[in-house]
């Protein structure tokens, strides 16, 4: 009987993993041996990965050490729970990468100082767990936000958690550019504000639970579009994503139990492209378009599967909406913006919708690349140098 229960649990886990588009396991189960990297371990820094000791200062010192000694590089974070209570600044070209059987988790402690009130002079009106910056932030200095010249910064295979008593906490601020990314990160926002403010370059296999928003964002750094692949949003109180001029391109997004999936800021436009994605239990409109019939709007959905989503879109200026009577349906295509039938036609503002009812939600796409079983440093192979 015990064996049967174990098999059932494994099967249920496989179903949940496949259904929700993201993987929550550690993708680096083994320690990468890299002579050029730094390791955030008790042997190297005065820390304990027990979730009780505050490692904020030690973590910031380790990140700054990588920047000072190498200018660019990796700080590897072993499996464990790491308590922090202040903003950690990650300068240009520094990457935090977790490893171990389970992903390491950084936890913002309950009632951490400064996370209770809105930060009026901050762009995101919030305080951040991790803020990607353009340079090392010295004590007493105002941070210089990451921008169009912030390359190679990243966080991967690490989970983040916001504990109670931090209503204006946001886990990540990521306004970086080329070769920068957030990947294999699950953010447990709880009663905090959001998982991420200001998107940058690429997000892959990211999950957001709770919060007012999973992501809220303005436009990306100048010249750099943003791609988000394999993402999951659940239980946000206002919207999965709040955006203005974000220019997001998204594939394999799953949003569940939210009032709205996309909420475009009042009087702003956006260019959103969404493909092969899933909406489930959306109580309000899936997308709120606040500035309809504007040439800067390009809202495009392709192959989006919906369950319990009675309103696909709301247009606030005209107080109209695109309603769908089917309980489960496929949005073969949805286009809002300027439309042309051919290259010589005059463009017109239109909303084009092609929907068909379906019997059940399909299984979400799942990455089938296996976890690594070994790690090889290229510099160890002398023949590759010639």
Identify the function of each model-found stretch.
Residues 4-6, 16-76, 84, 89-164, ...:
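Extracellular "leader-to-stem" segments immediately downstream of a signal peptide or signal-anchor
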Residues 9-13:
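Hydrophobic helical h-region of N-terminal Sec-dependent signal peptides
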Residues 6-7, 386:
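Short amphipathic alpha-helical "recognition" segments used for binding
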Residues 380-386:
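A short, hydrophobic C-terminal helix/tail in secreted or cell-surface proteins
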């Amino acid at each position: 009987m015990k064996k049967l229960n174990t098999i059932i649990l494994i099967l249920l886990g496989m179903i949940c993993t496949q259904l929700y588009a993201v993987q929550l396991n550690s993708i680096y189960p083994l320690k990468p041996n890299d002579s050029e990297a730094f390791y955030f371990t008790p042997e190297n820094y005065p820390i304990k990965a027990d979730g009780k000791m505050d490692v904020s200062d030690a973590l910031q010192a380790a990140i700054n050490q990588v920047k000072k000694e190498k200018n660019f590089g990796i700080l590897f974070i072993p499996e464990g729970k790491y308590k922090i209570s202040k903003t950690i600044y990650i300068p240009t070209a520094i990457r935090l990468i977790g490893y171990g059987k389970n992903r390491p988790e950084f936890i913002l402690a309950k009632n951490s100082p400064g996370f209770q009130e809105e930060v009026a002079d901050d762009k995101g009106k919030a305080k951040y767990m991790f803020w990607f910056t353009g340079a090392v932030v010295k004590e007493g200095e105002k941070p210089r936000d990451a921008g169009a010249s912030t390359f190679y910064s990243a966080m991967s295979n690490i989970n983040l958690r916001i504990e109670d008593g931090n209503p204006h906490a946001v886990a990540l601020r990521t306004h970086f550019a080329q070769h920068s990314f957030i990947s294999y990160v699950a953010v447990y926002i709880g009663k905090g504000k959001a998982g991420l403010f200001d998107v940058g370059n690429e997000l892959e296999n990211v999950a957001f639970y709770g919060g007012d928003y999973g992501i809220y964002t303005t436009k990306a750094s100048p010249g750099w579009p943003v791609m988000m692949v394999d993402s999951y949003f659940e239980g946000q109180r206002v919207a999965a994503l709040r955006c203005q001029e974000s220019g997001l391109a998204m594939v394999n997004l799953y949003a569940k139990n939210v009032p709205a999936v996309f909420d475009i800021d009042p009087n702003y436009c956006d260019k959103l492209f969404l493909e092969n994605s899933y909406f489930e239990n959306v109580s309000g409109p899936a997308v709120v378009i606040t500035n309809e019939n504007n040439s800067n709007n390009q809202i495009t959905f392709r192959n989006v599967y919906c369950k319990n989503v009675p309103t696909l879109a709301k247009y606030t200026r005209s107080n109209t909406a695109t309603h769908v009577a089917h309980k489960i349906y496929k949005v073969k295509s949805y286009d809002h913006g300027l439309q042309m039938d051919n290259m010589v036609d005059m463009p017109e503002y239109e909303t084009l919708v092609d929907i068909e009812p379906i019997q059940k939600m399909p299984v979400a796409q799942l990455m089938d690349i296996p976890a690594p079983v070994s790690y090889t440093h290229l510099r160890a192979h002398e023949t590759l140098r010639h």
